């Protein structure tokens, strides 16, 4: 465990290791979180102590499971992937709340559902599709 407020920093818990740089006591740049076997489970990007840009979380085989985009510590976009790397979920955020387009996919890559969020709540017409692409149902919010 490091106690410095500048430079390289490492911290270990029972299950995970955290490693990155500190600047004035705040995380800065790329931080890697690894499990006990040394496998990277997450890679986070910090600027001035806040999450900034793309952070990624990984399946045990190294494939990206989740990608979250941050601006000044707030989520702006969220993508989740199936274990083969196929896109599963896409969400837009504003000020840390779901806001904007939302899309969900079958493991085949075909669109499962789509709609919009406004200030964290579903709004408008949401469409859900069969794997063939035909509309299965519509819900209004």
Locations of the language-model features?
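Glycine/tyrosine- and acidic-biased, solvent-exposed loop/turn segments at the edges of beta-strands
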Residues: 1-141
